[in-house]
């Protein structure tokens, strides 16, 4: 039987789900905050940069992942919503083209207005977006490197915003970035736990299937703790952000003794994590506004 042709609305809907809309703010906000707090002005570069890190960047990051993880996603009962799309078998080429073409005009603009060091940061960010999932590197199958690479996806937009805006680097600013990076490592490690069985059956050698469910959970607890501690040494009101690590620790803690067989139960914690990010983001926004007022 001949498959029905894909309608544009159906393609758009699958690409939308594949881009993980619930996570858009996690990449756009760091860029916006870093750039705006450095330049103290809203300009075309800020607007286009936010749009780029809001949608095309996420479509590239998650869409490429959905293409190369298709077989494991078919075995994964949580796929098909906020956790990612199960693409129609005819969609992988469309997804890759959509990701590349949607990014292209933004990247061209950012290269034109940027400096050589900003080109380097942007190139590194996009390199890790692609080769986290794509062969030959497929970094998501290299334990611990997968968590670090995933973290780069989220803190690199902030680093790029700082570099593009010409920020002056201090050790305290470095601690803020390090704290964000540790949060990213912890979040990936926690998120990987729920897919132990599906990824192992698909032969995906990421941190959780290789090391078992408990190791990434303990890594997540350690990195969330270090992330909060790092903020204690930053400029006021930065130390208050250490409090924001506590809800993440409380979310992960109940699963610390989980077994591989019961790892799917961690999905409940991950669902809380997704919404916790929105609440934490609000707290970070208030602190950034306070910082902007103090330093204006």
What function would you assign to each model-found segment?
Residues 8, 215, 233-296:
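Extended hydrophobic alpha-helices typical of membrane-associated regions
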Residues 8, 13-16, 82-168:
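Intramembrane alpha-helical segments
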Residues 13, 22-26, 30, 45-53, ...:
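Alpha-helical transmembrane segments of integral membrane proteins
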Residues 28-34, 147-163, 208-213, 269-287:
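Small-residue-rich segments of transmembrane alpha-helices in multi-pass membrane proteins
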Residues 28-68, 118-130, 169-190:
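Membrane-embedded alpha-helical segments that form the functional core of polytopic membrane enzymes
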Residues 52, 70-122, 205-239, 278-282:
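Multi-pass membrane catalytic core of lipid/isoprenoid biosynthesis enzymes
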Residues 53-82, 186-208:
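Acidic (Asp/Glu-rich) catalytic motifs at the cytosolic membrane interface
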Residues 62, 128-140, 192, 255-263:
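C-terminal ends of transmembrane helices
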